[in-house]
């Protein structure tokens, strides 16, 4: 009998109905035994034509579409769109609104990373982190609901400011959350970080070098895990990030384990940012006083005919944005989320292009998984942090 067993190449379908695919993703794998030789990702199963739909909506009506892109971290998308429209309008946002935006964007980052770390752990076989982390996520979703009235699709950050001010008791409750949360993170750390099985499944899996990360267009934790300290909140500061103190966590190897460590460290930095904002937040208005962009108060509408007209015009016709084009990007939890808008001077965008960070990360899956075992693929997909709402758009 021969010592060499001939391995027949095999084509394997992974997804689109697979619990570890993180959405409707189909991967066509070319296998040499149990080793991955090539991966061909098939996307577009969640394509809804968002960019085209936006062309038929007013600038205010287009906003809720952004909540539905990366539906795990909705406020980050709204933020990029609002900043882009404000840049075209040359609209100044009140300082209290800027603080509220940063508070909720950082809570959104925590929301996103909690889901990613817990689902990555579940894919590998650790169930406890998921149950613990979803309990904490529920608290943040409760803050979302108290601020905007919705748990997920909040439409809270709008061009000109935010939808509404938050009550004093909500600020107090966020403070309490911020004070108790680091202890929870220590518990998760003790559960995963030095866990032998967790390290065996993640260390040296899906390694990406600095050069490869830049060539593939990586951003966010995926890029920082490779050792490149690039963060738009530091390199191209927006809102009040230049006034706040925080570090940029970076990795060394660029493997699945480093990506996990970077996200864990980012959660702690986000807590620091929220705490600083809560300590410094000033009183004042939360939306621009230009009534053509932001609606007047209900009390004003009961007294002033002009306020009533502004309200009606805003929600029926919308506002016209000066002709021009601009690109605005924010450091979303998954990476650089960018919005490019072309305005022709009317009340609807002529063109809206969305740059989703997950799209670039998913492209590199063939490069990352080649030569690894099939079982390692779930760890790699889990560490990518992909959501198909933003990839397929």
Swiss-Prot record:
Xref: InterPro entries: NADH_Q_OxRdtase_suD (IPR001135), NADH_UbQ_OxRdtase_49kDa_CS (IPR014029), NDH1_su_D/H (IPR022885), NiFe-Hase_large (IPR029014)
Catalyses which reaction(s): a quinone + NADH + 5 H(+)(in) = a quinol + NAD(+) + 4 H(+)(out)
EC identifiers of the protein: 7.1.1.-
Pfam families in the cross-refs: Complex1_49kDa
Enzyme class: translocase
Membrane topology: Peripheral membrane protein
GO cellular component: plasma membrane
Subcellular localization(s) per the UniProt record: Cell inner membrane
Keywords (A to Z) from UniProt: Cell inner membrane, Cell membrane, Membrane, NAD, Quinone, Translocase, Transport, Ubiquinone
Residue ranges that the Swiss-Prot or TrEMBL entry lists as coiled coil: none
Annotated GO MF terms: NAD binding; NADH:ubiquinone reductase (non-electrogenic) activity; quinone binding
Function according to Swiss-Prot or TrEMBL: NDH-1 shuttles electrons from NADH, via FMN and iron-sulfur (Fe-S) centers, to quinones in the respiratory chain. The immediate electron acceptor for the enzyme in this species is believed to be ubiquinone. Couples the redox reaction to proton translocation (for every two electrons transferred, four hydrogen ions are translocated across the cytoplasmic membrane), and thus conserves the redox energy in a proton gradient.
Subunit note: NDH-1 is composed of 14 different subunits. Subunits NuoB, C, D, E, F, and G constitute the peripheral sector of the complex.
Family recorded in the similarity comment: Belongs to the complex I 49 kDa subunit family.
Protein name per Swiss-Prot or TrEMBL: NADH-quinone oxidoreductase subunit D
Gene: nuoD
């Amino acid at each position: 009998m021969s010592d060499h067993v001939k391995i027949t190449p095999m084509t394997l379908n992974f997804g689109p109905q697979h619990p570890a695919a993180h959405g409707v993703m189909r991967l066509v794998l070319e296998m040499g035994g149990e080793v991955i030789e090539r991966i061909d990702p098939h996307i577009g199963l969640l394509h809804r034509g968002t960019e085209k739909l936006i062309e038929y909506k007013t600038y205010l009506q287009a906003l809720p579409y952004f909540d539905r892109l990366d539906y795990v971290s909705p406020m980050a998308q709204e933020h990029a769109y609002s900043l882009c429209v404000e840049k075209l309008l040359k609209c100044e946002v009140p300082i209290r609104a800027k603080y509220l935006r940063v508070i909720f964007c950082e809570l959104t980052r925590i929301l996103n990373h909690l889901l990613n770390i817990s689902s990555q752990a579940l894919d590998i076989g650790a169930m406890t982190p998921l149950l613990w982390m979803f309990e904490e996520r529920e608290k943040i979703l409760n803050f979302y609901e108290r601020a905007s009235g919705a748990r997920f699709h909040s439409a809270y950050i709008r061009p000109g400011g935010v939808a509404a001010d938050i009550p004093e008791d909500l600020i107090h409750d966020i403070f309490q959350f911020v004070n108790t949360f680091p202890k929870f993170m220590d518990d998760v750390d003790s559960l995963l970080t030095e866990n032998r099985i967790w390290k065996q499944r993640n260390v040296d899996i899906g390694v990406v070098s600095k050069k490869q990360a830049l060539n593939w267009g990586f951003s966010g934790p995926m890029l920082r895990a490779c050792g490149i300290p690039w963060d738009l909140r530091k390199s191209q500061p927006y809102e009040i990030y230049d006034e706040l103190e925080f570090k940029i966590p970076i990795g060394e190897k660029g493997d699945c384990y480093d990506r996990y460590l970077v996200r864990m460290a980012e959660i702690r930095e986000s807590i620091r940012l929220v705490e600083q904002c809560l300590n410094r937040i000033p009183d004042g208005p939360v939306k621009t006083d230009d009534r053509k962009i932001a609606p007047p108060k209900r009390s004003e509408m009961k007294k002033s005919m002009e306020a009533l007209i502004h309200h009606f015009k805003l929600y029926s016709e919308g506002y016209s944005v000066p002709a021009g084009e601009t690109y605005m990007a924010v450091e979303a939890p998954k990476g650089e989320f960018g919005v490019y808008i072309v305005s022709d001077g009317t009340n609807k965008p002529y063109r809206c292009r969305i740059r989703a960070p997950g799209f670039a990360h998913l492209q590199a899956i063939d490069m990352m998984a080649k030569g690894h075992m099939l079982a390692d693929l779930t760890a790699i997909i889990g560490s990518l942090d992909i959501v198909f709402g933003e990839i397929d758009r």
